Design a protein with these regions (language model features):
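Tryptophan-centered short beta-strand motifs
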Residues: 283-285
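Non-catalytic surface loops within mature trypsin-like serine protease
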Residues: 5, 139, 177, 251, ...
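Mature catalytic domains of secreted/periplasmic carbohydrate-active enzymes
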Residues: 1-225, 238-239, 259-261, 268, ...
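Non-catalytic extracellular/lumenal accessory regions of secreted precursors
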Residues: 231-235
């Protein structure tokens, strides 16, 4: 649910009435989050509080901690998007593009409505709190529906996907309803095309069960865990950097995307990676990047390699 802290139409929104306004906002939170008819049968995945405040608006101080406490009391582990170092932060732009590197850690004293956009986009490897940078963008040119505008092309959505989800962070794609409260047919068609593309992208894991050689920390973190397809296992090593791993796919496979994932239960630790493929007996670069995080999608040339 998106409930902006700035209510431009409320007569209570004034520095002389901060206590009244904060109570007013808190009452709205309680009304929405405690009603079983709202959300998904009363459950909410995320409460979205942006940092917007119009030019010339009163600089009312918000009682964020009281609001956050109420959200947690009523919705448990519901994610909170805000400027205040909560579980989700803004990525620093409204294009849906995350940075590389992208650390999901930040320092609280560098956040707030005046936070540097570059800091939000890349995070901080020395950060003291875990706050995921959420990439947000609209399927249309703006956040609201206009009849004379069209949705983004499939190619544009694919680029956004690889620069957000493909860089280890969630994508919030805005779909504005029209004046009848319905999604436009063109938007719906584009969403189906986008879903078809993603389904095709993940249709087959060519590396599933592939033989992997390289150093490993222990049997509990063996190399085979890299390709066993299980969410509960992972590989790790304490060897000196750079660490090299080699995958044998068993037979030549044709591909142009490689997916890497990191076991975030152990923290976000990968700071750089480099992928090569052997083509006709010669090793050549496929691609490289910095952080991995929850998921990294690396695009390269279409190759046939084992």
């Amino acid at each position: 649910v998106y409930l902006s802290p700035w209510d431009a139409h409320s007569p209570l929104y004034h520095v002389d009435r901060e206590a009244d306004y904060n109570a007013y906002y808190l009452a709205q939170l309680k009304e929405i989050l405690s009603n079983p008819n709202y959300g998904n049968a009363g459950k909410f995945a995320e409460v979205w509080m942006d940092g917007a405040r119009g030019e010339g608006a009163q600089k009312v101080n918000y009682e964020f901690e009281k609001w956050f406490e109420t959200i947690r009391d009523l919705q448990g582990d519901c994610l909170i998007f805000s400027t205040e170092g909560t579980s989700i932060r803004w990525i620093g732009n409204e294009r849906g593009y995350a940075g590389d590197p992208l650390w999901q850690k930040v320092n609280l004293d560098k956040l707030g409505t005046e936070a540097e956009l570059n800091y939000l986009q890349h995070g901080d490897p020395s950060g003291t709190i875990f706050s995921i940078g959420e990439a947000d963008v609209s399927i249309r040119p703006g956040w609201f529906y206009h009849e004379d505008q069209d949705p983004k092309s499939l190619e544009e959505l694919v680029e956004i996907y690889f620069h957000s989800v493909g860089r280890g962070t969630p994508l919030l794609l805005n779909i504005p309803p029209n004046q009848a409260g319905l999604f436009d047919a063109k938007d719906i068609e584009r969403l189906y095309e986008f879903a078809t593309y993603r389904n095709e992208l993940y249709k087959e894991d060519l590396a599933l069960g592939a033989e992997v050689s390289g150093p490993a920390l222990s049997a509990d973190f063996a190399c085979r865990h890299l390709t066993d397809g299980l969410e509960t296992s992972s590989w790790a090593s304490d060897a000196d950097l750079p660490i090299q791993l080699e995958l044998d796919l068993g037979s030549p496979k044709t591909f142009d995307v490689i997916e890497l994932r990191e076991d975030l239960k152990l923290g976000q630790r990968i700071a750089a990676f480099h992928v090569q493929v052997e083509v006709d007996g010669v090793w050549q670069e496929f691609g490289r990047g910095f952080t991995v995080g929850q998921k990294r999608l690396l695009r390269g040339p279409l190759v046939e390699a084992q």
